[in-house]
Structures are given as C-alpha cells and as structure tokens.
Amino acid sequence: ESLVSGMRVGTDQLDPQKKIGYLPENNPLYLDMYVREYLDFVARIYKVSNRSAQVKKMIHSVGLEIEQNKKIGALSKGYRQRVGLAQAMIHDPEVLILDEPTSGLDPNQLVEIRSLIRSIGEKRTVMLSTHIMQEVEAMCDRVVMIKLGEIVADEDLEKFVNDKGGLEEAFKQLTS
C-alpha cells in the first residue's frame, strides 16, 4: 500500500495525484511550444489558480528567465531538464518524483541541476530514481534500495557511507 499525504494511491485516485509532481527520464516536452507557453499550458491542466504568477515563479525558481521566450526545441538538454522540473512543480506538489533527472547532461549542467534539486528538496519531499551512486551522494539524505520490487535497505546516506563501505559496495551486496 502506498500513501501520499495520508491518502491511498490507487484508491483515492485523484487527490494523491494532485500532491505529486513527476519528471520522467525521457522528459516528454512539446518542442514546438515556447517555454512560458508550455508552462502555462501545464498550469491550466492542473487548474492552478493565479496561473501567470505561478508560471513566473517557476521560471525564476529553475533559472529559465533568459530562455522563457524560446521554443523548447531550441534549448539545450540542461534547459529542457529545467523546463521539466518547472512543469513537475507548477501545481506546488508536496512530493516530487524525479526519474534519472541528470542523464545526458554535460558537467556544468550536472552541477547546476544537482544544486537545483538539492534546493528543491529543502522545501518538499523529493524522490530520486537512479542507478548512479554519485548522483545519490550528491543529492540525497536518505537511500532506499530495491531488489525485485522489494525494499532491501532504507537508511540515511551517512550510514551507507560510514558503516557499509560506501553506496556502490552496499548496492552490490544488497542487490546481487
């Protein structure tokens, strides 16, 4: 059974979904739309009140001010990830789920997106799905490892680093 803000996912179908923001690995964006236009479109879908102000806030919070009047198709992968993060947060969800949010980024974009995700995590719950242990170390406080759909570990990051010989070693031992 999965709960989001005390509501059962699957049973109380609509309410939990409103409390979750999701950025999939392949970040499906409308490449022919402008950044601001796309975020407004997503905000309308979520029935965000004060849409214009929320779009402006998201553009600022993910650092898209300079890019906001460009077509998404003209953006770099790093800026497209920022658009994806903004759309995932446009309705101010309590929980943000990010699937491989840094894949394919260059080193500069990687540092920027990691920092952005860390700052987002100060205000809301962020769940990060990745197989890259360096990403976990850079962005996470808590680690949950899963093998064949079952949780095999759920610890603070420090415990893995200090007591289990590091994340990669723990991952090998727990998932082999």
Would you name each region that the model predicts?
Residues 40, 44-67:
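Conserved ABC ATPase "signature" region
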